[in-house]
Amino acid sequence: MSKQEHRLVEEFLTGQMSRRELIRGLMAAGLSVSAIGGLLASTGVSTRAEAESLVEAQHATAKKGGTPRFTTLVPAADVDPVTLFNEGAIFTAQICLEYLCFPRKDYTLEPKLATSWHSSQPNTWTFNLRKGVKWHDGTHFTADDVVATFDRLTDPKVNSAALSAFKGILSKGHVRKNNSHQVTFHLDRSYVDFPYLVSAFTYNSFILPKNYKAGSFTKGRIGTGPFVLTKYTPKVGATYVANKHYWAKGLPHVAGIELKYYSDNTAQVLALQAGAADVLLDMPYQGSQAIFSSPDINVLSIPSSAYRGFHMRVDQKPFNDKRVRQAVAYCMDRGALVQGLWHGFALPGNDHAFAPIFPTSVLPIAHLPQRHQNYAMAKKLLAEAGFPNGFKATLTTENFLEIPQYAVFIQQQLKPAGINITLNVEDQNTYYGAGANQPWLQVPVGIVDWAPRGTASQLVGPAYLCKGIWNSAHWCNAAFNTHMAAYDKELNLGKRKHIALQAAKVMYDETPSIIAYWIKELRAERKNVHGLAISSFALLDPTGISLS
């Protein structure tokens, strides 16, 4: 029995999942009907005959056929898996491409093109690859494809959107083929959470054919996933058909998928309400309230590590004094923010990057006092920093989801302390820019939408380490870097929790960014939709979807 199979059976035996969920998990792991029957019989879950009957029933209850219609935002540019960065492009690729592993809703990892992985030491990781997998053109998936994929992503000349995620951790040429279905990653430094970097939490880590050419994805028939891209129309959408040779037996259930692009969330909501769409994949609360009362629609909610970083440039006055940054933090009414912007579909943050969903966040959450609005403290800190009458600043951000409303909230909350904020809201492409013109990395004060990450290291690395490529606060703290380096090396979970507390204390005290809330992600489905995997709703695994 593999580690994955053992874990699934153990979760069933301890009451953490139903028999139906157990069988679905084993099917997703690629086991055949007879293999599942034998496994469940050998572990005493049921007899072989009972188990095989249950598996067949599981398949039978999922109605075959139909074409579910998904909605997402228009991709910023033509979709290429190596360079994509926004939601619409990510979903377009995730329907037909696969990763080595994929996150579950509790942020544990499910094997996909890798069946297992292990580390002999924190800087060396070996992955065993799934056998019998074919590309959509009929050729066989092998270790050569995995080596080529990560050489491509880590090549500075390629301009991969994942280059920043792998910087300082994995370099080009450091993935070795051991045999046709096993590879070893030789890391630049110890990184205990490395499997998350090759999962869907690094969007661009799609496994592509060894001979992949930039710009060829939208021509179709590239991937190993449950659906095959057959048509892509810029600004309009994409069409997929079921992969008849998919490696997971009995899947997919539906005949295909239609992905439709919309200009904004309002248009997506209207399409779902009108019956022109079946699933709104990643839904903000603001602008979607009408859906919650619809009798034909289910709204799903899960906790996540997604947040909005309200950063302050620590290398520019007045934010070069941490007392000013702390004063700003004490102006924020986080409870009102969670209720007003999210109607409770968020959790209060406390200005450190250890999200409640991470296992190592227990001690930071327990031991760091939750900040609450305290104007007396804010004014005291401002006076000590030399700003008894407050100051003026311009907050620049993007016109995306609830962020403009959040900016107005900040403006209103800071005013009683004498901090007068002027708002500058730009479209997304302008705000993030390119090359030497990237306002979000240059403005003195800004808000950034941070998508969910699988671990604290993934979240912290690009944004808060001294050499972080997306360090919009321009914050560099030697103690924090030292703590995170120790965190990345430590295998013992208990010890990691204590290191996390030390790192969180530094960030909490320094306050380079205000993390006022952690988002509970939302997805809306018509009630005839079943089986769509629940992971982070910023990610998509459509394998098990069916329609009734």
Functional labels for PLM-detected ranges:
Residues 245-290, 411, 420-422:
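Ligand-site clamp/hinge motif
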Residues 126-128, 371-372, 422-431, 458-527, ...:
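Extracytoplasmic/peripheral linker and loop segments enriched in polar/acidic and small residues
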Residues 195, 290, 315, 319-359, ...:
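Periplasmic-binding protein-like
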Residues 71-121, 151, 220-224:
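N-terminal lobe/hinge region of extracytoplasmic solute-binding protein
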Residues 1-21, 28-30, 43-45:
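N-terminal secretory signal peptides
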Residues 104-108, 180, 191, 199-258, ...:
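Gly/Pro-rich hinge or "lid" segments in bacterial periplasmic/extracellular proteins
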Residues 227, 347-384, 402-405:
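Structural transition elements
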Residues 118, 128, 162-209:
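Surface-exposed binding/hinge segments that line
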